[in-house]
Amino acid sequence: MSVCYRPPGNETLLSWKTSRATGTAFLLLAALLGLPGNGFVVWSLAGWRPARGRPLAATLVLHLALADGAVLLLTPLFVAFLTRQAWPLGQAGCKAVYYVCALSMYASVLLTGLLSLQRCLAVTRPFLAPRLRSPALARRLLLAVWLAALLLAVPAAVYRHLWRDRVCQLCHPSPVHAAAHLSLETLTAFVLPFGLMLGCYSVTLARLRGARWGSGRHGARVGRLVSAIVLAFGLLWAPYHAVNLLQAVAALAPPEGALAKLGGAGQAARAGTTALAFFSSSVNPVLYVFTAGDLLPRAGPRFLTRLFEGSGEARGGGRSREGTMELRTTPQLKVVGQGRGNGDPGGGMEKDGPEWDL
């Protein structure tokens, strides 16, 4: 693609020094937090084989860590790009690297949406829990997620171009292509999944309050987790997609108008907003620690598997450890009592009925 539509002003990803500096700082911090964090998640869950099979939620979290870790491995390239102000890998590398980034973005978004939907169904439709534990279902869902991500990421490679042999950035043959691509990306990677997440967590919280969980310690933990997940996704991705929409609208505006010139400002701000979005790949392990609470000092490095063991999806029944979230199917909906301790290895288990993961 030799001819690229460019907004007025001739700005590039490297035009604003502030955007380059903040982008570099965000990338370094994201890698510092996310690489060891996601590596720990993979180490904890990849080799975990409970007797009844790995819970669906744990499998989704494992693949989420793989997707997030893959894109964080590319941070040295982007840091070099921003600091040296020149793309280091040529035209083929420009397309390939951004394709991997888009693949990771879509996989992470789809997996997060599935996690939200799984927890919502576990609360509102507990009779579906046996099906949600099926390994065959997990394989089909993961295959669908990765195939969808592979397809949705294709435009990221098609519309990337090495401009003047030094700037790897979006290159659309016409304003219509630019508006369509950027709008579709925001719709599929933010608006629809974020709407699903908000809807699922709203329904989940409403059901938990209806079960009189809202005022107890379990309800407080669930509320903090829900708020953290929704806020992290929205806050970290909103600036990136705001730039998308700004450039999409500017592409269709009259070339001499003020709105068209804002498209150039969005292009220059893209480096910083893209780097901020990298934090979405590093915050999930922090949220798992946040969720574990008192389970972390008691269970040590295995707190993540203990967290899923306590969810009720990994076993047929048992006492709820403090800090886990369960619903038990009995003639009446009730909260499972606390065990001997939060994550205490000595906590006994009793087989008294199925429990459903939230």
UniProtKB/Swiss-Prot annotation:
A Gene Ontology term for the protein's cellular component: nucleoplasm
| Phosphoprotein keyword on record | no
Classification via Gene3D superfamilies: Rhodopsin 7-helix transmembrane proteins
As for subcellular location, the record says:
Cell membrane
GO annotation (BP), single: negative regulation of adenylate cyclase activity
Give the Extracellular compartment stretches of this protein: 1-24, 82-96, 162-185, 246-275
What is the membrane topology noted in the UniProt record heading this document?
Answer: Multi-pass membrane protein
Per the UniProt entry, the glycosylated residues are N10
Q: In terms of one coarse class, where is the protein primarily found?
A: membrane
What InterPro entries does the entry give?
Answer: GPCR_Rhodpsn (IPR000276), GPCR_Rhodpsn_7TM (IPR017452), Leukotriene_B4_rcpt (IPR003981), Leukotriene_B4_typ-2_rcpt (IPR003982)
- Spans traversing the lipid bilayer: 25-45, 61-81, 97-117, 141-161, 186-206, 225-245, 276-296
Q: Where is the composition biased (Gly residues)?
A: 338-348
Cytoplasmic topological intervals:
46-60, 118-140, 207-224, 297-358
The UniProt family comment states: Belongs to the G-protein coupled receptor 1 family.
* Comp. bias regions, Basic and acidic residues: 349-358
Q: Lineage of the source organism?
A: Eukaryota, Metazoa, Chordata, Craniata, Vertebrata
Protein name, as recorded = Leukotriene B4 receptor 2
State a single Gene Ontology molecular function: G protein-coupled peptide receptor activity
What is the recorded function of this protein according to its Swiss-Prot or TrEMBL entry? Low-affinity receptor for leukotrienes including leukotriene B4. Mediates chemotaxis of granulocytes and macrophages. The response is mediated via G-proteins that activate a phosphatidylinositol-calcium second messenger system. The rank order of affinities for the leukotrienes is LTB4 > 12-epi-LTB4 > LTB5 > LTB3.
Q: Does the keyword Cell inner membrane apply?
A: no
Q: Which segments carry the region annotation Disordered?
A: 311-358
Cross-referenced Pfam families? 7tm_1
